Amino acid sequence: MALSLEEVRRIAQLARLRLSEEEERTFAGQLSAILDHVRQLEELDVTAVEPMTHALAAGELPALREDAVRASLAPEEATAAAPAREGTAFKVPRIIE
């Protein structure tokens, strides 16, 4: 099932993206292909597959670095270019009722 251009426009609006008509057509095709792959995955019988808590087995985890405090942006700087904010938080439209 292909996504309509109207659905792509709605997704872009929620993501606050401005897309050209060419980008809308391109993304409609790309997103439709992704959704088709997900539908194929949903059809797989995974009842015999043991659930995992991580994409890699415990012995295969890559070495993680130690946490280290580093300089970062102040909250005001990080949200300065946001189209809408409340204090130092990004303000976004509710998408889940």
UniProtKB/Swiss-Prot annotation:
SUPFAM superfamilies: Glu-tRNAGln amidotransferase C subunit (SSF141000). Its EC number is 6.3.5.-. The keyword Metal-binding does not apply. It comes from the Bacteria. The keyword Ligase applies. Keywords: ATP-binding, Ligase, Nucleotide-binding, Protein biosynthesis. One of its GO terms (molecular function) is ATP binding. Pfam families: GatC (PF02686). InterPro entries: Asp/Glu-ADT_sf_sub_c, GatC. Coiled coil: none annotated. It catalyses: L-glutamyl-tRNA(Gln) + L-glutamine + ATP + H2O = L-glutaminyl-tRNA(Gln) + L-glutamate + ADP + phosphate + H(+); L-aspartyl-tRNA(Asn) + L-glutamine + ATP + H2O = L-asparaginyl-tRNA(Asn) + L-glutamate + ADP + phosphate + 2 H(+). GO terms for biological process: glutaminyl-tRNAGln biosynthesis via transamidation; regulation of translational fidelity; translation. Allows the formation of correctly charged Asn-tRNA(Asn) or Gln-tRNA(Gln) through the transamidation of misacylated Asp-tRNA(Asn) or Glu-tRNA(Gln) in organisms which lack either or both of asparaginyl-tRNA or glutaminyl-tRNA synthetases. The reaction takes place in the presence of glutamine and ATP through an activated phospho-Asp-tRNA(Asn) or phospho-Glu-tRNA(Gln). Belongs to the GatC family. Heterotrimer of A, B and C subunits. This is Aspartyl/glutamyl-tRNA(Asn/Gln) amidotransferase subunit C. It comes from Anaeromyxobacter dehalogenans (strain 2CP-C).
